[in-house]
């Protein structure tokens, strides 16, 4: 089985490459170069996602597995009179989850600037309502790490409306086996799929069905994996994080098998097949329901594709904020993926 340490190191590399939805070219290039090194056939779709294909014995029925490499982020909405930046969020999260975070601003010419996302009324020595003021677009801003005093100063740096903003991942691997970072959703799963591909190649595993691996790049806005699905595809498995919180079964130490999200139930027979594989191979798993969640698989169903769809992934604490998971969850997810791609279809 693939090394969890190598998976965690790959996650660290991936989260360190900024890739907010809409600006994923650099990380897609990086992944494409890895797959080329491993002599894996790839093609890009027009949306900018990457599809890798491994041939199988049965070429009439295909599988597709997907994970998304796009992350939460922001765009410059306005340059304020004092030279600071108002932002517009990309993806589903709240301003409080990025308050105090370091960030990067990429200009249209490709130049990078750094800054910090702050409340305008941050100083408790000046603003009486510093703790009570609402964290919203009007009150949050980017303080640039440049000597700017007015709108013109910022414009002269080349910064403008529509420039992408990415957040510092602050990635760290602990001695106790955790990896904590922004954007484990869903770069942890991308790393798992890449390590699976590498394992299939190096072990010369013959897959029962031709299998496609889609690295999607628009999942955080709802349509990453809803197209470019080969017509022979029967099973479609999204690999994405399991969410942890009150009333949830998911934890940081097992693989999550989603039975239902905001789109409705996932395919019952595929769910049962995944559970049977987990029990047969002594894989720790949790069945769970995510009420405010969607995936590439649910997006594909909504787009009208006639597929058997499923969703599994590592359990991620504090999703869409300061995320964390444990090597145990990564190991169990990797194990289930390994046995799934070699199993018969439902």
Curated annotation (Swiss-Prot):
Listed GO biological process terms: proteolysis
Annotated a divalent metal cation 2 binding sites: 185, 220, 320
GO molecular function, one term: metallopeptidase activity
InterPro entries per the UniProt record, alphabetical: Peptidase_M42, Peptidase_M42_aminopept, Peptidase_M42_dom2
Co-factor remark: Binds 2 divalent metal cations per subunit.
Required cofactor names: a divalent metal cation
EC number, as in UniProt: 3.4.11.-
Protein name: Putative aminopeptidase YhfE
Residues noted as binding a divalent metal cation 1 in the record, renumbered to the chain: 68, 185, 240
Gene3D superfamilies membership: Peptidase M42, domain 2 (2.40.30.40), Zn peptidases (3.40.630.10)
Pfam families, sorted: Peptidase_M42 (PF05343)
Gene name as annotated: yhfE
Family under the similarity heading: Belongs to the peptidase M42 family.
Top EC class for this record: hydrolase
Keywords linked to the UniProt accession: Aminopeptidase, Hydrolase, Metal-binding, Metalloprotease, Protease
Organism taxonomic ancestry: Bacteria, Bacillati, Bacillota, Bacilli, Bacillales
Residues at the catalytic site: 219 (proton acceptor)
């Amino acid at each position: 089985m693939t090394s969890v340490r190598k998976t965690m190191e790959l996650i660290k590399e991936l989260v360190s490459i900024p890739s907010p939805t809409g600006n994923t070219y650099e990380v897609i290039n990086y992944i494409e170069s890895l797959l080329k090194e491993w002599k894996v056939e790839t093609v890009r779709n027009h949306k900018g996602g990457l599809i890798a294909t491994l041939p199988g014995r049965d070429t009439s029925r295909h599988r597709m597995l997907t994970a998304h490499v796009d992350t939460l982020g922001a765009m410059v909405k306005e340059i304020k009179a004092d030279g600071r930046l108002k932002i517009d969020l990309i993806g589903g999260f709240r301003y409080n989850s990025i308050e105090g975070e370091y960030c990067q601003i990429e200009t249209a010419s490709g130049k990078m600037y750094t800054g910090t996302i702050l409340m305008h009324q941050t100083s408790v020595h000046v603003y009486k309502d510093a703790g009570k003021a609402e964290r919203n677009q009007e009150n949050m801003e980017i303080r640039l790490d440049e000597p700017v005093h007015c709108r013109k100063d910022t414009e002269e740096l080349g910064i403008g409306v529509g420039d992408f903003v990415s957040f510092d991942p602050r990635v760290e691997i602990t001695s106790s086996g955790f990896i904590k970072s922004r954007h484990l959703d869903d770069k942890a799963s991308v790393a798992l799929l890449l390590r699976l591909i590498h394992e299939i190649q190096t072990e010369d595993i013959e897959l029962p069905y031709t299998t496609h691996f889609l690295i999607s790049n628009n999942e955080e806005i709802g349509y990453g994996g809803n197209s470019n699905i080969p017509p022979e595809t029967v099973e479609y498995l999204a690999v994405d994080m399991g969410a942890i919180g009150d009333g949830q079964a998911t934890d940081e130490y097992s693989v999550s098998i989603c039975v239902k999200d905001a789109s409705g139930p996932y395919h019952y027979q595929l769910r049962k097949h995944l559970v049977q594989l987990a029990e047969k191979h002594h894989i720790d798993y949790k069945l769970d329901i995510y009420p405010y969640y969607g995936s590439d698989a649910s997006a594909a169903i909504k787009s009208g594709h006639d597929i058997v769809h499923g969703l599994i992934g590592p359990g991620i604490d504090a999703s869409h904020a300061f995320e964390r998971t444990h090597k145990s969850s990564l190991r169990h997810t990797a194990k289930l993926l390994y046995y799934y791609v070699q199993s018969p279809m439902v």
